[in-house]
Curated annotation (Swiss-Prot):
Keywords: Secreted, Virulence
SUPFAM superfamilies: EsxAB dimer-like
UniProt organism field: Staphylococcus aureus (strain N315)
Gene name of this polypeptide: esxB
Keyword Secreted: yes
Gene Ontology cellular-component terms listed: extracellular region
Assembly mode: Homodimer. When mixed with EsxA does not form heterodimers.
Localization: Secreted
Transmembrane segments: none
Protein name: Type VII secretion system extracellular protein B
Length: 104
């Protein structure tokens, strides 16, 4: 991966970040589905009363929050992919070569 004074990127770390971001995205989606299913199970069960309703409401709030994390996580993955691709090209950019001549 490319680099310039003050700009450092370790190719292995960027790849690790890509792998971890993919795992996190997958885990968030799985967790959201499980939370939603649990809320639906409670709603359809014989468990009734104020406490049951509060537990279900909390689970629905959690499921909504988890659902809202899906798009930002996808954006994060795209940003890491773009970083990886652009850093690989960094050393060949004419602006970088010009900066090297000005600031050796």
């Amino acid at each position: 991966m490319g680099g310039y004074k003050g700009i450092k990127a370790d190719g292995g770390k960027v790849n690790q970040a890509k792998q971890l971001a993919a795992k996190i995205a997958k885990d968030i989606e799985a967790c959201q589905k499980q939370t939603q299913q649990l809320a639906e199970y409670i709603e359809g069960s014989d468990w009734e009363g104020q406490f049951a309703n509060k537990v279900k409401d909390v689970l629905l709030i959690m499921a909504k929050f988890q659902e809202e994390l899906v798009q930002p996580m996808a954006d994060h993955q795209k940003a890491i992919d773009n970083l990886s691709q652009n850093l690989a090209k960094y050393d060949t950019l004419s602006i970088k070569q010009g900066l090297d001549r000005v600031n050796p």
